Each structure stands twice: as C-alpha cells, then as structure tokens.
Amino acid sequence: MNVNVRNLREDDLDDADTILRLSFGTFMGLDDPMSFFGDSDFVRSRYTTDPNSAFAIEIDGNLVGSNFVTDWGSVGFFGPLSIHPTYWNKGIAKHLIIPVLERLAKLEIQYAGLFTFAQSPKHVYLYQKYDFWPRFLTSIMTKTITEKNDEKRLELSQKHEKPHDVRFTEIRNDVKSLVLDDCKYLTNGIFPGLDLQKEILAVDSQKLGDTILLYDPSGNKLTGIAICHYGKGTEAGSNVCYIKFAAISTNNNSQSNFVRMLNSVESMALEKGICKITAGSNMERHLAYKAMINYGFKSEFQGVSMHKGNKQGYNTPSTFIIDDWR
C-alpha cells in the first residue's frame, strides 16, 4: 500500500467533498450517508481561503481523504478530517495529522485545537497521541426564527439597547482595511494574537455571507463582530445562517452587547428569508452558553473541543465568543 500525502488541488475538490460526506454520514449511521451536510460545503470554501492549508492523502494513487487547517492569527484548529470508510481502522488518519501539525507550527500558532465526536473513544484517543486533550463539551445550537419575533426575543430586546450595527458588505472598499484593523484590535483584546481578518475577507470575497459589526450607541467604537455564512454552497446550507465566529469585547456591557449581537444576526437572517440560525457554544464559556439558551437556542448535537497541551485559551466563563472549530 503506497501512501502519499500532499496539498489538496483544485481538481481534487469534488472527490474530497464526496469522501467527506460519505465518511461522516457513515459514521453517523445515516441510511443515505451522502445526504450528510445537505447542500452546505466545507471543502471548497476552506480550500479557496488557503490552499496551502488543505491536505490530501492518496493510497496507490487514489484520493482517500483530506484535512484542513484554519488559522485565526495566534489561534488555529484543524478539520474536518475525513478518510474513506474503506480505509478505516488501518492507521491512515495519522498521516493527515502530521502535516497539519507542521502547518500549525509554520503559522506560529500559539493555541491549537480541534472539534471531535465526544462519544467516540477512538477519536479522542487518536488525538491524545498528539498532545490534544479533551476539555469542555461544545454544543452546536440552533434557533428557529419566524417573521414575527417571539415573546422571549421581544422581552430581551426591551431589556437591552437596540443594535447599532453595520455589515461588512456595506462598507466602502477604501475604508475596509481600517475596519479590519478595528476587528483585530477587538479580538486581540480578548485573546493575544486572535485575528479574524482572513475569515472576514474569505466570507466577503467568496460571497459566503456577511460579517456584522456591532458598535456602541455612539457609533464610534466597535464592540462586537459576528462572521456569518448563509445559503447553499456555504458552511451553513440553504435556509440557515451559521455564526462561524462571533466575539464581544470584554467590559461591563459584554452580556448586553452579546444579546444585541444575536438580535442583529436574527434581523439579518429574517431579511434574507432564513428560518434557522446555527451557532457553536463551548460550555466552558458559561455566561455566553447560558445567554444563548435564554435567547431561545437549543442544542442539536454536542462534540468536545480538544486543546493542544490542554491550554484553556479563550474559553473562560466570562468570555463572550461563539465558535465550534468544526
């Protein structure tokens, strides 16, 4: 058996997407494994964002799996890692972990992790071999929305200021770099080196959705961001708005600003005719997790975040961040 690991190529993308769906759908026990992920797409957007961070594995010249690195400045994670079911339990996955570790090192990532199935000892054991350790559960949460705001949202809206938000797609091109600097300043204040500029630009250039920029009531200071995918061919899929990352600056108004941000996301979703919001909440970020429950989000499924060196990173009880590292 001849194993070859290399960078993923554009002409691999269809096969890589097929293997990803088949792998995850088979593991989850679906009658039709290829229906997993619906019409969402993880492979193409992540490859387009950074081809140097997309990896392929071949056996005897045939593509059998892929893996991706995502870097947010000093923070990085990898996945989804997929191997064709024919090659499960043959020690193949480890060949796709080594190159991502090398990539994380080259990018000088200080805080690295991944998301995996909490119920699978096999997955957890594999990653522990490389010094990734399970910490808190991450809940993938959803909220169904309607044209008329439900009573709970109205109640919350009355308690908190109305959003003062701008969407990145509405900003003039000549000032976008300044806005990106503000975003970097905000996230760096939450965790040193955390930088979502690449993610914001990927969403903008690939037309995957939009980024909400939440300002204080004066409209002068950025207090939060929410990077959202929506629609077919994105990581969300049809009729879904997926909050891939959101963060609120740390201050006395963090909790109320978090609710304002959720209001802004919901308003955008309603405007786009979208009926569901999906977002990940690490349970170590207790106040954010609790706020999402109070807002009407419910857990759809749970995984576990595994952290290199067992670092806590930005997962503290009082940190208002949304992400899931899938």
Regions flagged by a language model, labelled:
Residues 129-242:
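Amide-forming acyltransferase catalytic core, primarily the GNAT-like/NAT-type
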Residues 80-83, 89-106, 111, 128-129, ...:
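Conserved acetyl-CoA-binding loop-helix of GNAT-fold acetyltransferases
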Residues 13, 17-68, 191-212:
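Active-site rim helix/loop that mediates acceptor-substrate recognition in acyltransferases
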Residues 60-66, 76, 220-225, 241:
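Glycine-rich phosphate/pyrophosphate-binding loop shared by adenosine-nucleotide-utilizing enzymes
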